[in-house]
């Protein structure tokens, strides 16, 4: 694990191959992230590893019936869960795209382009610390990863390369659930 990571990405116990592929794509595409293989580690052990890494947040990908179901965030410094949960209604891995998408080198820079102008862009900016823009034309060729957020039935989060072609998995977010923590 690298020092100086901002966000640790991990899963629930015994994740499916699809969830692991999503985690690997996220870590490869989002600079400042690192993954922790959960295994049988307790929550306290995950916190200790996050503190040792210097992470600010832990992003948990929970799954239900072998599919990613929700994305939750834990603030390591304040020792509290963030009050929102992103409910995932589906993902599309690199293998499911109609053309072959090879894995690119790890990203060194990223930007969020929020065409939905909704809350998901603000959440991603808070957690990952990337700048947020509202126009796709302004970022072509400037960043290794463009996190494009579009409005559909919920939200569609696409990870694009600097050429604005697909870089990694895309995530369909059904809704943002605010909960009492």
From Swiss-Prot:
GO biological process, one term: rRNA processing
Top-level lineage group: Archaea
Keyword Disulfide bond in annotation: no
InterPro entries, per database record: Brix (IPR007109), Brix_dom_Rbsml_bgen_prot (IPR023548)
Annotated keywords: Ribosome biogenesis
Domain Brix residue range list: 5-181
Keyword Phosphoprotein recorded: no
One MF term in the entry's GO annotations: rRNA binding
General function of this protein: Probably involved in the biogenesis of the ribosome.
Name assigned to this protein: Probable Brix domain-containing ribosomal biogenesis protein
Organism: Pyrobaculum aerophilum (strain ATCC 51768 / DSM 7523 / JCM 9630 / CIP 104966 / NBRC 100827 / IM2)
